[in-house]
Amino acid sequence: MARIAGVNIPDNKHTEVSLTYIYGIGRTTSRGLCERTGISPQAKVKDLSEEQLDVLRNEIAKMVVEGDLRREVQMNIKRLKDLGCYRGLRHRHSLPVRGQRTKTNARTRKGPRKPIRK
């Protein structure tokens, strides 16, 4: 297994798909990476040479991925909470942030139903 950005990516998959195992890289980004580095998206990772893997590692090192990206997202949410803005309050109360209805649905965000106290 090749190790890129601290993640073991599978050898037996296409490069385009294998790169999506890295947090912060989806299909579109991985396709763009392959295009910029001159690596075929359909090539299997096990068929790539060490030089090609180094080029991929260098290109990914320029991006914000994995732990840095997770930290950045958490800091953005913390900033919203500290500001006390509407979105921050929604995060704080574990409610949907982007305007979805909450009278019905939103169970994933709100958690299991709580019994009504009389």
Swiss-Prot record:
Keywords on record: Ribonucleoprotein, Ribosomal protein, RNA-binding, rRNA-binding, tRNA-binding
Which is a GO BP term held by this UniProt record? translation
UniProt xrefs under Pfam families: Ribosomal_S13
Q: Has the keyword Glycoprotein been applied to this entry?
A: no
Q: Which domain of life is it from?
A: Bacteria
Q: Where are the transmembrane segments?
A: none
Q: Report one GO cellular component.
A: small ribosomal subunit
Q: How does it assemble?
A: Part of the 30S ribosomal subunit. Forms a loose heterodimer with protein S19. Forms two bridges to the 50S subunit in the 70S ribosome.
* Primary role: Located at the top of the head of the 30S subunit, it contacts several helices of the 16S rRNA. In the 70S ribosome it contacts the 23S rRNA (bridge B1a) and protein L5 of the 50S subunit (bridge B1b), connecting the 2 subunits; these bridges are implicated in subunit movement. Contacts the tRNAs in the A and P-sites.
Q: What is this protein called?
A: Small ribosomal subunit protein uS13
Give the source species: Hahella chejuensis (strain KCTC 2396)
Record lineage: Bacteria, Pseudomonadati, Pseudomonadota, Gammaproteobacteria, Oceanospirillales
